[in-house]
Amino acid sequence: MQSHEPHPGMTVRVKAGHWKSKFDGMRGTVEHRWGHPHHLALDVLLEDGRLQLFWFHELEKA
């Protein structure tokens, strides 16, 4: 996935090795995009109902 790809409504997965390991492999839906495409942050509504902010590089297309 490239930084221009994620958009609201897209399903993503947290990459393994995330610094908060409880999120490893969780799926969610992109709610909002923030910042410059080279330093993109994404609000993701996770499958457990939590809204969490991730850096682009911490996610992959599900």
Each predicted region: which residue ranges?
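Basic/aromatic-rich interaction segments and small domains that mediate binding to polyanionic partners
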Residues: 7-62
